[in-house]
């Protein structure tokens, strides 16, 4: 049965495909979309950026032409795109897929996006830029220990849940209490309901062996350089955006910008980019294991069997 034949029938549960970078998620999602009349919805926080097609390994234009793809490259790099903004866009994509009778397939490696999708999201108001910038300046000037002590004095509950390695989360908690007068924990308790309740999705986490994954990460980074990643980063750097913006911190971008400034050789920048990506993959394993235990862990060589079961389930649910 062709994609066109199945693409308009009613669909049951959504499918969530997660995993570390370079684990083969995109290929699996495309195969499932073709087999089950699906639409691919991005759940990767870096692949949303228009400026970063190559360095973030977004699907190719040829793949995008085969089945509908949503939430890829739809945000300018100058935007500090939040999880809340993604959830809003994802809700529209999910509604559109269901209206067309297509299987919604969420794919990516950003754990917070999947957590928001399946467990809801807190309703913290937007933090004024001046508050955020002031907290960041204090972090750089005084260090993380001083910032954590400040948080402990103002929001001991939040501080008690964070250690000194959580620089970003410490700063975030302090921003929230300064801007709103309320603890981040209180805001979390008033969160939005999930887009996908527990019984409304199938979820898989692709888990290659570490050695295999790291080899794939290294090879893919080199392939991205060969495909023009350096020129892409050069165009991004020419915009002179705030280096703290998410797009400016995508894996490989800071090191390649340092190369363009003459601070690193290309080999040195590539070595840093590969290492940063491997470290991120390691953190992804840890995060999903502890935060999203409902995901079924599958080795890449077992993925086809899982995919066949999902196709059969989609047909039964539709």
Curated annotation (Swiss-Prot):
Cofactor(s) recorded in Swiss-Prot or TrEMBL: Mg(2+)
Gene Ontology molecular function terms on file: ATP binding; tRNA dimethylallyltransferase activity
GO biological process, one term: tRNA modification
Region of interest (Interaction with substrate tRNA), ranges: 44-47
Reactions performed catalytically: adenosine(37) in tRNA + dimethylallyl diphosphate = N(6)-dimethylallyladenosine(37) in tRNA + diphosphate
Annotated binding of substrate, by residue: 21-26
Magnesium as UniProt keyword: yes
Site (Interaction with substrate tRNA): 110, 132
One Pfam family recorded for the sequence: IPPT
Entry's EC annotation: 2.5.1.75
Family classification: Belongs to the IPP transferase family.
Protein name: tRNA dimethylallyltransferase
Gene giving rise to this polypeptide: miaA
């Amino acid at each position: 049965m062709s994609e066109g034949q199945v693409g308009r029938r009613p669909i049951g549960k959504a499918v969530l495909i997660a995993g570390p970078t370079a684990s083969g998620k995109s290929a699996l999602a495309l195969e499932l979309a073709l087999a089950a009349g699906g639409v691919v919805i991005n759940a990767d926080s870096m692949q949303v950026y228009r400026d970063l097609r190559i360095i973030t390994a977004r699907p190719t234009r040829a793949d995008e032409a085969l089945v509908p793809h949503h939430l890829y490259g739809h945000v300018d790099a100058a935007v500090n795109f939040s999880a809340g903004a993604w959830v809003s866009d994802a809700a529209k994509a999910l509604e559109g897929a269901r209206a067309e009778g297509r299987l919604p397939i969420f794919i990516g490696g950003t754990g917070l996006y999947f957590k928001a999708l399946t467990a809801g999201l807190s309703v913290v108001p937007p933090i004024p830029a001046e508050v955020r910038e002031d907290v960041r300046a204090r972090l750089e000037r005084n260090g993380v220990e001083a910032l954590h002590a400040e948080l402990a004095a103002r929001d001991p509950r939040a501080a008690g849940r964070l250690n000194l390695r959580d620089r970003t989360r410490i700063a975030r908690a302090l921003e929230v209490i300064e801007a709103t007068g309320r603890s981040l924990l209180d805001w979390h308790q008033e969160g939005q309901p999930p887009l996908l309740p527990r019984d409304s999705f199938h979820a898989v986490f692709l888990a290659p062996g570490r050695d295999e994954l790291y080899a794939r990460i290294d090879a893919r980074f080199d392939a991205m350089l060969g495909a023009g990643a350096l020129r892409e980063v050069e165009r991004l750097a020419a915009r002179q955006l705030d280096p703290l913006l998410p797009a400016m911190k995508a894996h490989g971008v800071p090191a390649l910008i340092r190369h363009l400034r003459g601070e690193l050789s290309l080999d040195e920048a590539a070595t840093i980019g590969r290492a940063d990506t491997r470290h991120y993959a390691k953190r992804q394993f840890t995060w999903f294991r502890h935060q999203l235990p409902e995901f079924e862990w599958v080795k890449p060589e077992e993925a086809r069997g899982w995919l066949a079961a999902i196709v059969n389930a989609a047909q039964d649910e539709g």
